[in-house]
């Protein structure tokens, strides 16, 4: 969810709506309205504006292991040339769900969820390494997910 604006200004009501949805994405608009002093319709409109602006998403977060995906990994990618172009190509790969351009040992980090090790190897060898500009990859296989939260607040 790349942001379209650099620093959108949110009022306290919008921030509270976001925080309430971070706690429970299924919370009703009428419940949120009671908490922030707005009507259900006003909350619905604010949520729609926040999602349309790319400020937030409301999604179901699944446990990949429960769905049959046995391998999760972060792939560090070193690049020559325009990192943004390579990152766009990597982001277009369906099996990759998270791509960031970084400053440090790797130019790009990509998070993947695969069915098994064979699927992971195929993804790296057939989809990532052939991209023009990819110099090398290093894969960090997740042994155990210790913590994953999405409630970092709104400042």
Task: Label the model's feature ranges.
Residues 1-155:
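A compositional/biophysical signature of low hydrophobicity enriched in polar/charged and small residues
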């Amino acid at each position: 969810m790349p942001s379209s604006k650099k620093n959108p200004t949110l009022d306290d009501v919008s921030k509270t709506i976001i925080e309430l949805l971070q706690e429970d994405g299924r919370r009703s608009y009428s419940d949120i309205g009671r908490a922030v002093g707005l009507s259900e319709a006003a909350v619905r409109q604010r949520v729609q504006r926040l999602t349309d602006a790319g400020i937030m998403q409301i999604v179901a977060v699944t446990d990949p292991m429960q769905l049959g995906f046995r391998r999760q990994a972060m792939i560090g990618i070193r690049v020559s040339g325009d990192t943004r172009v390579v990152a766009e190509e990597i982001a277009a790969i369906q099996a990759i769900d998270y791509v960031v351009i970084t400053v440090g040992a790797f130019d790009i980090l990509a998070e993947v969820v695969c069915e098994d090790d064979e699927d992971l190897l195929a993804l790296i060898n057939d989809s990532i390494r052939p991209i023009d500009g990819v110099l090398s990859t290093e894969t960090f296989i997740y042994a155990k997910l210790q913590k994953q939260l999405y409630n970092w607040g709104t400042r």
